[in-house]
């Protein structure tokens, strides 16, 4: 018989740095899941990813207190900030521009995020990422 799903828990945890402290501990503790098992498994799964990069994770909690999890790619805004080398986006994106991003850089991000995006093709994914860049106050070139 299939296990009964009791909850889906969505978190953003830094790659290789999962620990029992918030937000991981309280979210898993409420469901009665073993926090250290998750931390060890997550840190092992994100070992090849750049350390400290926030990774979205969806944890499926089952009624027998077991869990599975799926890691996703980092948010586009984080990847854009990393490429451009800024700490945060513009507070007024339509008037204050904080950096420039090229079509090639957008394509690289779109290829990275391809699995998590619902875009029909690479061009649609690039347009989506370009929209995120503009809303952060970045100038899209090309």
From Swiss-Prot:
The gene is rplK. Part of the ribosomal stalk of the 50S ribosomal subunit. Interacts with L10 and the large rRNA to form the base of the stalk. L10 forms an elongated spine to which L12 dimers bind in a sequential fashion forming a multimeric L10(L12)X complex. PROSITE patterns: RIBOSOMAL_L11. One of its GO terms (molecular function) is large ribosomal subunit rRNA binding. SUPFAM superfamilies: Ribosomal L11/L12e N-terminal domain, Ribosomal protein L11, C-terminal domain. GO terms for biological process: translation. This is Large ribosomal subunit protein uL11. Forms part of the ribosomal stalk which helps the ribosome interact with GTP-bound translation factors. One or more lysine residues are methylated. Keywords: Methylation, Ribonucleoprotein, Ribosomal protein, RNA-binding, rRNA-binding. GO terms for cellular component: cytosolic large ribosomal subunit. The lineage of its organism: Bacteria, Pseudomonadati, Pseudomonadota, Gammaproteobacteria, Lysobacterales. InterPro entries: Ribosomal_uL11, Ribosomal_uL11_bac-typ, Ribosomal_uL11_C, Ribosomal_uL11_C_sf, Ribosomal_uL11_CS, Ribosomal_uL11_N, Ribosomal_uL11_N_sf. Belongs to the universal ribosomal protein uL11 family.
């Amino acid at each position: 018989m299939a296990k009964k799903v009791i909850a889906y828990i969505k978190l953003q945890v830094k790659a290789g740095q999962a620990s029992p402290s918030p937000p991981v501990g309280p979210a898993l503790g409420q469901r009665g899941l073993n926090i250290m098992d998750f931390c060890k498994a997550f840190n092992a799964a994100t070992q090849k990813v750049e350390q400290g990069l926030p990774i979205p994770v969806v944890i499926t909690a089952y009624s027998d207190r077991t869990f599975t999890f799926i890691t996703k790619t980092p948010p586009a805004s984080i990847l854009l900030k990393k490429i451009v080398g800024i700490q945060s986006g513009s507070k007024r994106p339509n008037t204050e521009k904080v950096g420039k991003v090229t079509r090639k850089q957008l394509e690289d991000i779109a290829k990275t995020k391809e699995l998590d995006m619902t875009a029909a093709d690479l061009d649609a994914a690039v347009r989506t990422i370009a929209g995120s860049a503009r809303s952060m106050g970045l100038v899209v070139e090309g």
